[in-house]
Swiss-Prot record:
HAMAP family hit by this protein: MurC
Family of the protein in this entry: Belongs to the MurCDEF family.
Enzyme nomenclature, EC number: 6.3.2.8
Name of this protein: UDP-N-acetylmuramate--L-alanine ligase
GO biological process: cell division; cell wall organization; peptidoglycan biosynthetic process; regulation of cell shape
Pathway field: Cell wall biogenesis; peptidoglycan biosynthesis
Native source organism of the sequence: Yersinia enterocolitica serotype O:8 / biotype 1B (strain NCTC 13174 / 8081)
Disulfide feature: none
Function: Cell wall formation.
UniProt main location, coarse: cytoplasm
Catalytic activity annotation: UDP-N-acetyl-alpha-D-muramate + L-alanine + ATP = UDP-N-acetyl-alpha-D-muramoyl-L-alanine + ADP + phosphate + H(+)
Amino acid sequence: MNTQQLAKLRTIVPEMRRVRHIHFVGIGGAGMGGIAEVLANEGYQISGSDLAPNPVTQHLTSLGAQIYFHHRPENVLDASVVVVSTAISADNPEIVAAREARIPVIRRAEMLAELMRFRHGIAVAGTHGKTTTTAMVSSIYAEAGLDPTFVNGGLVKAAGTHARLGSSRYLIAEADESDASFLHLQPMVAIVTNIEADHMDTYQGDFENLKQTFINFLHNLPFYGRAVMCIDDPVVRELLPRVGRHITTYGFSDDADVQIASYRQEGPQGHFTLKRLDKPLMTVTLNAPGRHNALNAAAAVAVATEEGIEDNDILRALAGFQGTGRRFDFLGNFPLAPVNGKEGSAMLVDDYGHHPTEVDATIKAARAGWPDKRIVMVFQPHRYTRTRDLYDDFANVLSQVDVLLMLDVYAAGEPPIPGADSRSLCRTIRNRGKLDPILVSDSETVPEVLAQVLNGDDLILVQGAGNIGKIARKLAELKLQPQTKDEEHHG
């Protein structure tokens, strides 16, 4: 970015006073990396630390950021401000050093709020669907030539990045309720996709507390702002009278302001109509499978329509939507060894969903788009607390697949909880009589175990939020063929 471009940008977003060098602790996370990328492109000096390199840190390095793969006090001493992710503990040596040096230490959402402060902010909140909905809104605004800034929690495939600095007043961002930090944001428009019990440790196990926090978030909208809310969700519907702001509802429900009708799925695409108040009927082809993605698209259409974006721009963006990383992410269709003389192949899909509702939506999308295929799922539970709190829901949802490979729980720093482990979950599913899960304690053996159960016309769902994405990429690299010991040795 040249000096002239930077000067023009400063007329939209005033420079943060006395801030020159911004340091991120936990910079490799998607949400942190996205904000760091926008700030790097605004001309700030960026540094950060994390435990290991990943695509996010590699990309930031290419933008000129200084990345350390260790946490040491000296990393922060030149910083104007330190931004910290929720995964970082207060006794981290960089946090301790920053506080001792009287360097401000802020959470990720505070920096996002600062980026949003002088822009027209569109914040996407909810338990599920945030990342995809944020990407859809961003895609529509880009298609309309509005050149938005966006900060997303997942890879926006069309842009090849989690975040992008635009030249306009629009900032589209995912709003994270996991630590209640979305309360820092003060957007002009807020989407709420749904509200379910998740991250309940943040809310003292009190669902009423979680609901009130969403209301407080919506009250951050100015009185002339707008809440776009999914009326199909019973909790969202219950909260509507308490919002006290202009509201547009969306969903399949008859009383939705933006109503989805005549939904059908053909392979990876959804086809439906949208009825809007005082607007012509919109016939949509969406390049994303599942009714849940039709809901995400309806939210994006509601926001775009309110902003006055032309229908043709909306329709082009949705038909050409390239999706986001690890959200029903198609990794390939691979030929398999013949079974009983019949040639076969298997489709490989990687998905981040790790809550029973998300897993259920992914399975339903797979069944609707490919009804003749067996669903073979490789599932990694995420966190012992979530497995404990939603144990029966997981058992019910996972029982819907045809073949289930279960990895050990990805702890995410939590201590084990008796009875909330993968072996117990496998036993519960087995005892219900629908399915005999295969427990895979060594994730390195997934290619071998999977090869033994595939039969030539399968859809493989690699499902979870831990490190299972690496397994999906490994399966794609191997084209579903397990390595021999000799190949492993020479690889």
